[in-house]
Amino acid sequence: MTTAATPVRRAVRQDPAERRRALYHLASPVSVLTTGPEERMHGTTASTVTLVSRSPLLVGVVLRAGSSFARLAAAEGRFAINVLGGEQADVARRFADSSRPDGSASFAGLAWTADRYAQAPLIAGALAHYVCRFHSAHAAGDSELLLGHVVRATADEGLPLLSYTGGLFAGSLRPAKETAAS
């Protein structure tokens, strides 16, 4: 297949607030990323986690540029992704709070177990856990894309915690209405 190059057009001027409002309509599951071991534990909330490749199985996480999590995950060589359930908004807020304590103190009072491979906390009640080997990190504008090679994944039943229009929602997943093909 041959594709012709599209001429580059001048950027359209648009109010940044309007673009931001439009982006708020991208609903996404909320996860807490963790790395360990216990003496170097760290967690952070992320709402942009996606499948990048099925073979090899790679997931991507978008973080703020200069994120300490990306640096720590690279140094440890492994990390975990905890996909939060609809009743775990408090966990998401805890790890999104920049004034939270460092290290294991940020996990105080939270039920978790250390993964035997990653030594990272797997948060109890999460809908899914992806244990990853660090693959790479890439600068992407004002963000950083962290890629992980999934070495183990587990899933449970329940509704997801979703980020939508700037808020957190306990996901109510209704099947879309089907219409007859015309």
Regions found by a protein language model. Name each.
Residues 2-182:
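Basic, polyanion-binding surface patches
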